[in-house]
Amino acid sequence: MAVVLRLSRAGTHKAPFYHVVATDSRNARDGKYLEDVGIYDPTKRPERIELKVERIEHWLKAGAKPSQTVAMILKRAAKAAAPVAPKA
């Protein structure tokens, strides 16, 4: 079973938001999944990104591969969460 981290669409017509899920690569986009590991809402400004970081790390260590979009979201979240060093 090839596990992937990808987006599952939710919301209404023209107002989507997405769940970040760990699922088998053969399942449909909005089909069954193994675990819900976060939320991504691109309609909010700034974008709403809520991730269960420890569960995402667990799945990545277990061999799950993130989709291109989820990889981009993970990079944005890591960049936003990184502490800013004070200027000397």
From Swiss-Prot:
GO biological process terms held by the UniProt record: translation
Keyword annotations: Ribonucleoprotein, Ribosomal protein
Cytoplasm in keyword set: no
UniProt GO MF annotations: structural constituent of ribosome
GO cellular component: cytoplasm; small ribosomal subunit
Entries under Gene3D superfamilies matching the protein: 3.30.1320.10
InterPro entries documented for this protein: Ribosomal_bS16, Ribosomal_bS16_dom_sf
Pfam families: Ribosomal_S16 (PF00886)
Protein family per UniProt: Belongs to the bacterial ribosomal protein bS16 family.
Protein name, UniProt field: Small ribosomal subunit protein bS16
Taxon lineage: Bacteria, Pseudomonadati, Myxococcota, Myxococcia, Myxococcales
Gene name linked to the record: rpsP
